Swiss-Prot record:
Classification of source organism: Bacteria, Pseudomonadati, Pseudomonadota, Gammaproteobacteria, Enterobacterales
Site (Essential for catalytic activity): H136, E174
Catalytic reactions of this protein: D-ribulose 5-phosphate = (2S)-2-hydroxy-3-oxobutyl phosphate + formate + H(+)
Residues annotated as transmembrane: none
Gene Ontology terms: biological process: riboflavin biosynthetic process
Cofactor(s) needed for function: Mg(2+); Mn(2+)
GO molecular function terms noted in the UniProt entry: 3,4-dihydroxy-2-butanone-4-phosphate synthase activity; magnesium ion binding; manganese ion binding
Broad class of enzyme this protein falls into: lyase
Gene: ribB
Enzyme Commission no: 4.1.99.12
Name of the protein this chain belongs to: 3,4-dihydroxy-2-butanone 4-phosphate synthase
UniProt keyword Magnesium, yes or no: yes
Chain residues that bind Mg(2+) 1: E38
């Protein structure tokens, strides 16, 4: 990632700390991966605190595929099978079957309905019957070990939520341009500045976690 582009957001460690602070303040974070990987920016929000307005922003400016990142333990708690047995996608993205809240929604498509679905899925006592299948929210199962195991947006989301003190669950959606093309780093930076979002790269988060784990050992 071109560090010059990111310099206004601080050093790599500062970017992670700023992202954690933003999440605790109820703001979103733009997460960039490597230019040699997906080369995308994902808007992420804590599943616990994401507002209807933030969901609407995500739907309006994103790909439309609103994903709920969860751990494998949560996936098992909700009895959500993986979308396919043999995952042949380029990066092995861990989609489960899609979901909808069993109660409190209409068509499930609106920002408010998707928030209701997210909250139902992450509730402390959530059970499989709390969700209908299929639906309009796409759960993603994160790999154990986070970004140190897999350098994906899914794992970055779970790591950031955990480090910020939230439940290990977050909402993500890829940022797109007005013409429907994928937003790259310059557009992601412009969007983050416009919408008061912190910005961090997966590379930043890997370095941050490695440094903290070295200290802990």
């Amino acid at each position: 990632m071109n560090q010059t582009l990111l310099s206004s957001f601080g050093t790599p460690f500062e970017r992670v700390e700023n992202a954690l602070a933003a999440l605790r303040e109820g703001r979103g974070v733009m997460v960039l991966d490597d230019e040699d990987r997906e080369n995308e920016g994902d808007m992420i929000f804590p599943a616990e605190t994401m507002t209807v307005e933030q969901m609407a922003l995500t739907i309006r400016h994103g790909s439309g595929i609103v994903c709920l990142c969860i751990t494998d333990d949560r996936r098992k708690q909700l009895d959500l099978p993986m979308m396919v047995e043999n995952n042949t996608s380029a990066y092995g993205t861990g989609f489960t079957v899609t979901i909808e809240a069993a109660e409190g929604v209409t068509t499930g498509v609106s920002a408010a309905d998707r928030i209701t679905t997210v909250r139902a899925a992450i509730a402390d006592g959530a059970k499989p019957s709390d969700l209908n299948r299929p639906g309009h929210v796409f759960p993603l199962r994160a790999q154990a070990g986070g970004v140190l195991t897999r350098g994906g947006h899914t794992e970055a989301t779970i790591d950031l939520m955990t480090l910020a003190g939230f439940k290990p669950a977050g909402v993500l959606c890829e940022l797109t341009n007005d013409d429907g093309t994928m937003a790259r780093a310059p557009e992601c930076i412009e969007f983050a500045n416009k919408h008061n979002m912190a910005l961090v790269t997966i590379e930043d988060l890997v370095a941050y976690r490695q440094a903290h784990e070295r200290k802990a050992s």
